[in-house]
UniProtKB/Swiss-Prot annotation:
GO terms for cellular component: cytoplasm. Non-essential, abundant cell division factor that is required for proper Z-ring formation. It is recruited early to the divisome by direct interaction with FtsZ, stimulating Z-ring assembly and thereby promoting cell division earlier in the cell cycle. Its recruitment to the Z-ring requires functional FtsA or ZipA. Belongs to the ZapB family. The lineage of its organism: Bacteria, Pseudomonadati, Pseudomonadota, Gammaproteobacteria, Enterobacterales. Keywords: Cell cycle, Cell division, Coiled coil, Cytoplasm, Septation. Residues 1-78 form a coiled coil. InterPro entries: Cell_div_ZapB. Gene3D superfamilies: 1.20.5.340. One of its GO terms (biological process) is division septum assembly. It is found in: Cytoplasm. Homodimer. The ends of the coiled-coil dimer bind to each other, forming polymers. Interacts with FtsZ. This is Cell division protein ZapB.
Amino acid sequence: MSLEALDQLQEKVQKMLEANALLQMEIEEFKEKNIVLEEKINAISAQQKDLVDQNNELKQEKTVWQNRLNSLLGKMDDI
């Protein structure tokens, strides 16, 4: 191999190493963003669970109040 060919090969290898380093940095950034997104998903999932629980409690309270109201209306009809 000529010296010129070796220089070109060395330059290509250096460019590939630099590109590889940049890609590794991008991968690390994506991993960090992924962690943040997973934390947000977990927080939203917890909020959703709380809202579902609260909704179920409100539905139960509504049923209790409807039963009480129907009972009172039934007593009024008896009078």
